[in-house]
UniProtKB/Swiss-Prot annotation:
One Pfam family here: Ribosomal_S10
Origin species: Kineococcus radiotolerans (strain ATCC BAA-149 / DSM 14245 / SRS30216)
Coiled coil (residue ranges): none
Subunit structure: Part of the 30S ribosomal subunit.
GO terms assigned for molecular function: structural constituent of ribosome; tRNA binding
Upper classification of the organism: Bacteria, Bacillati, Actinomycetota, Actinomycetes, Kineosporiales
Gene3D superfamilies referenced in this protein's UniProt entry, alphabetically: Ribosomal protein S10 domain
Matching InterPro entries: Ribosomal_uS10, Ribosomal_uS10_CS, Ribosomal_uS10_dom, Ribosomal_uS10_dom_sf
Protein name: Small ribosomal subunit protein uS10
Similarity annotation: Belongs to the universal ribosomal protein uS10 family.
This protein's GO CC annotations: ribonucleoprotein complex; ribosome
Amino acid sequence: MAGQKIRIRLKAYDHEVIDSSARKIVDTVTRTGASVAGPVPLPTEKNVYCVIRSPHKYKDSREHFEMRTHKRLIDIIDPTPKTVDSLMRLDLPAGVDIEIKL
């Protein structure tokens, strides 16, 4: 697989979970002999939802909720077949969304 690059994008609501997952991926890749660029922190996406506190009236009294999506980017340069196999077997937490591009 010479000259190839694997790009991994991670998304999660909890920054501690995504950082530990990125650390696991980087450790696994370096152990198998491929080189790694990252993890690169991408901009955090922040969604704010505004809700009226009262069910009937008092429109001036509102409550704001926000949901933050943390993102990380990892590039694996010149992966070996052993690298790909170990990434397939890697167990990551349920709260992390993984997107892999070859």
